[in-house]
Regions:
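Conserved mid-domain beta->alpha element of the FAD-binding
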Residues: 14-32, 36-41, 163-164, 195, ...
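FAD/FMN-dependent oxidoreductases across multiple families
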Residues: 215-219, 226-231, 235-240, 246-323
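Residues at the starts of beta-strands that form the adenosine-phosphate
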Residues: 11, 34, 241
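Short Gly/Pro-enriched turn/cap motifs at secondary-structure boundaries
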Residues: 185-187, 220-224
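C-terminal helical "tail/cap" subdomain of flavin- and related membrane-associated enzymes
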Residues: 2-9, 80-83, 87-88, 323-324, ...
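Short helix-loop capping/hinge motifs at secondary-structure junctions, enriched
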Residues: 202-209
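Acidic/histidine metal-binding catalytic segments
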Residues: 73-74, 132, 274-289, 349-358, ...
Length: 429
C-alpha cells in the first residue's frame, strides 16, 4: 500500500503510556493536533522503584515548563556519584553539578515521575490540546503506511503519525521491522538479573557506617561493586524513600522472567550479597518485599521507522540500566519528535511525514545505539575476583552521554565533526 498523500487531520497516535509515550505526548502538544495515547494496562499501579533523569534529559524536561507538576513530587538533585568496593572503601567520588552539562541529574520515585508526565500530557495548562489517554487498550499491530492501529478488541484508530512507545515487547516494532534485516528481532536475556528493593527511610535502623563512607541523608547515588555483583542505591521522594538495584548473574537465563514483579525471598538477596558490607545488608533486611527482574535488551535494529510509524524508547533501543540512561534516552526521543515534527500539520503529506521520521532516526540512531553498547560494556565484571580492586570507571562515558542539547544540535555537531575529519583526511592525502 502506498503512503497516502492527504489526511484530513493531523492526529498523533501514541502506543504505550510509559515514560516514553507520555514524554512524546507532552513534546507533540500543539494547536491543531489531537493526541491519543493507547495503553494496554489500567494505569492504576506504576512500578515501585527509584529512577534518575540524567542531565541530558533533565535539560529537555526543564524546557517543557512542567515544574508545576514535578515540584510536588519532591524530586532530588543528585549531588555526587560514589563508588565503593565490597569492603566499603571509597574508590571514586564524582561530584555532579549543573554547570558541567547545563542541568542536574535528578532522582525520582518512578511512580511520581510517571504521574507528573501524565499530568503534563493531559493538563489544560500546557500548550496545545490535552492528550487523551485510553487505558485497557491493547494494540496488536498497525498498518505503517496508512497509520492504522489495530486494537485487541477488534477496533482500529488512524493517525497521521504513529509513535510506537510500547516497550521492550513492542507490537509496533514487529510491524516496523517486517521485511527488514531485523525482522523477528526480540528482547534477549543479557545474563543479568536485578533485585529491586524500596524501603521507607524512617524505618531503617541506625547504620554502623561512617558518614564519610555512606550518609543515608545525603542526596547522592552510591554503587558498591563486586566481581560479578553490584548494588546501585540512592534516595528518592525528598529522602522519604531509599531504593536499591542489586545486579546478579541471571539464575535462569532461559526463563521468561520479564516481569518487574517476580517475587523473591529476602533471604535469597542477603545470601547473594553476603560478601558486601553489613550496613548495606541492614538496609536490605528492611525490605517489605523484593522483586526479581530479568534484564533484557535488544540488538540495534536496522530501522526504527516505516511509513507513518516510528519507534521510540525501549521499543527502539531497550538497554541495560548500568548507565541509568534508559528513561533519559526516551526523553531524548520525545524531544527529537518535537524538533523534527514542529511544522507537521494537516497539510503534511504522508511522504513529508515519513521524510521527517527518517530525519529523526538519522539524528538519533547512532547515539542511542552507542549508549546501548556502552551500557552492555558497563555491565561486565567490574572488580577483580577477590573483590578488592574496582576496575569500573564511571566517568568513561559521562561526557558523551550528558553533553547534549537536543537532536538538531547533535546532528549539527556530528555533521561538523564529519566535515572536519574529511578535511583532515584530504589534507594528509
Amino acid at each position: 500500500m502506498a503512503i497516502r498523500s492527504e489526511v484530513e487531520h493531523w492526529d498523533v497516535v501514541i502506543v504505550g503510556a510509559g515514560i516514553a509515550g507520555l514524554a512524546a505526548a507532552i513534546a507533540l502538544r500543539k494547536d491543531g493536533r489531537s493526541i491519543l495515547v493507547l495503553e494496554k494496562s489500567s494505569m492504576n499501579k506504576e512500578v515501585g522503584a527509584l529512577i534518575s533523569l540524567q542531565p541530558n534529559a533533565s535539560k529537555i524536561v526543564d524546557g517543557w515548563n512542567m515544574q508545576q507538576f514535578l515540584a510536588e513530587k519532591k524530586p532530588m538533585v543528585d549531588e555526587a556519584f560514589r563508588l565503593l568496593n565490597v569492603e566499603g572503601k571509597l574508590q571514586v567520588e564524582m561530584k555532579l553539578n549543573t554547570s558541567q552539562f547545563g542541568a542536574d541529574r535528578m532522582l525520582y520515585h518512578r511512580q511520581d515521575l510517571h504521574d507528573a508526565l501524565r499530568q503534563a500530557a493531559t493538563s489544560d495548562d500546557m500548550p496545545g490540546s490535552p492528550a487523551v489517554i485510553r487505558t485497557s487498550s491493547g494494540v496488536t499491530g498497525c498498518d505503517c503506511e496508512s497509520g492504522t492501529v489495530y486494537l485487541s478488541n477488534g477496533s482500529s484508530v488512524q493517525g497521521s503519525v504513529v509513535i510506537g512507545a510500547d516497550g521492550i515487547r513492542s507490537a509496533i516494532r514487529d510491524e516496523v521491522i517486517k521485511g527488514s534485516a531485523s525482522e523477528g528481532s526480540k528482547a534477549i536475556p543479557t545474563g543479568l538479573s536485578a533485585y529491586r528493593i524500596l524501603v521507607e527511610t524512617d524505618k531503617l535502623p541506625k547504620l554502623e557506617v561512617s558518614e564519610d563512607v555512606f550518609d543515608l541523608k545525603r542526596s547522592a547515588t552510591t554503587m558498591i561493586v563486586g566481581h560479578d555483583k553490584r548494588i546501585i542505591m540512592g534516595p528518592g521522594r525528598g529522602g522519604e524513600m531509599f531504593g536499591l538495584v542489586c545486579l546478579v548473574p541471571d539464575p535462569n537465563p532461559d526463563g521468561e522472567g520479564t516481569s518487574w514483579n517476580n517475587p523473591a525471598p529476602l533471604e535469597e538477596v542477603l545470601e547473594a550479597f553476603k560478601a558486601f558490607p553489613a550496613w548495606v545488608r541492614d538496609i536490605m533486611s528492611q525490605a517489605p518485599d523484593v522483586a526479581l527482574w530479568q534484564l533484557r535488551d535488544i540488538d540495534p535494529l536496522t530501522t526504527w521507522t516505516k511509513g507513518r510509524a516510528i519507534l521510540i524508547g525501549d521499543a527502539a533501543h531497550a538497554m541495560l540500566p548500568t548507565q541509568g540512561q534508559g528513561a533519559s534516552q526516551s526523553i531524548e526521543d520525545a524531544e527529537a519528535l518535537q524538533a523534527f515534527l514542529s511544522d507537521s500539520d494537516s497539510k503534511s503529506s504522508g511522504d513529508e511525514v515519513h521524510a521527517q521520521l527518517q530525519a529523526i532516526v538519522s539524528a538519533r540512531y547512532e547515539r542511542a545505539s552507542l549508549i546501548q553498547a556502552y551500557s552492555r560494556l558497563q555491565a561486565k565484571p567490574a572488580a577483580s575476583k577477590d573483590n578488592k580492586t574496582v576496575q569500573l570507571n564511571p566517568q568513561e562515558f559521562m561526557e558523551y552521554n550528558c553533553n547534549y542539547s537536543g537532536a538538531k544540535d547533535w546532528a549539527k555537531r556530528q555533521r561538523e565533526a564529519e566535515e572536519m575529519a574529511y578535511k583532515q583526511t584530504a589534507a594528509r592525502a
